Amino acid sequence: MKQEKHGVLLVNLGTPDAPTSSAVKRYLKEFLSDDRVVDTAPLIWWPILNGAILPIRSPRVAKLYQSVWMDEGSPLLVYSRRQQRALAARMPNTPVELGMSYGSPSLAEAIDKLLAQGVTNLVVLPLYPQYSCSTSAAVWDGVARILKGYRRLPSVSFIRDYAEHPAYIAALRQSVEHSFAEHGQPDRLVLSFHGIPKRYARLGDDYPQRCEDTLRALTATLPLAPERVMMTYQSRFGREPWLTPYTDETLKGLPAQGVKHIQLICPGFSADCLETLEEIKEQNREIFLKAGGEKFEYISALNDEPAHIDMMQQLVAQRF
């Protein structure tokens, strides 16, 4: 009887290959063409995407990427690679590969590498702590689509999410408490999650509930009164209503309520990226300070912190 061999596929969203208009355009086209992300009918959406959004947004977004690009590359890819290497070091007998839903390294490349190493039991870990149809489900679709091309399939274990997992909450708590120790306790701790259209939630996506589960679990562990911890949603796109309260509008209004010092963490982002380093750390910081705020500290994503890798190892080991 052939011995089973486990392998791990870490998945994140993806990133352009370079901070250029052409690279950003390629990436955005792939990303925004996924009907899990934008479910508008193709006959309506494609002319909008190709005729307006890509030509207008690509140069603008490229400039934003240039402001956060690291020597090693895109922050999301840099931190994701570090996560992969750190987890692989913890599990020397288990192949660990990284794949992105959009861009490079692709899911197909990662799965090919794992199966070429004889993996018979594949554990898929989408690095989205809170399930959403637009992220986690898109990973499911991608993995299934790729495996359809194989005659011999591995067993597949798919980790839906980990919004309340004790090791995840412990890693967040450690990060927040480190910030408190360095900067003092803020008037408000803001948890900013990526938003989704309200319509997606009405149609059954339980993402808002999973964000609230994380908020509740983390708040219970912190040395801060619950009324001083709040949740918002960022990165809205398009004209239809998204989940509220919006992060930027909330930060603009807080100083008028006497809130002068905030610390902000983005628990839904497993690695720092454009949305955290530019949108939050730069744009939203400026919004808060211009509105009369005095102190703003961004608490980094968990990235490759040891507690985060501990969590990944626990999640994966539970599927072996």
From Swiss-Prot:
It is found in: Cytoplasm. Fe cation binds at H194, E275. GO terms for cellular component: cytoplasm. One of its GO terms (molecular function) is ferrochelatase activity. InterPro entries: Ferrochelatase, Ferrochelatase_AS, Ferrochelatase_C, Ferrochelatase_N. NCBIfam families: hemH. Keywords: Cytoplasm, Heme biosynthesis, Iron, Lyase, Metal-binding, Porphyrin biosynthesis. This is Ferrochelatase. It catalyses: heme b + 2 H(+) = protoporphyrin IX + Fe(2+). The keyword Metal-binding applies. Pathway: Porphyrin-containing compound metabolism; protoheme biosynthesis; protoheme from protoporphyrin-IX: step 1/1. Catalyzes the ferrous insertion into protoporphyrin IX. It comes from the Bacteria. The gene is hemH.
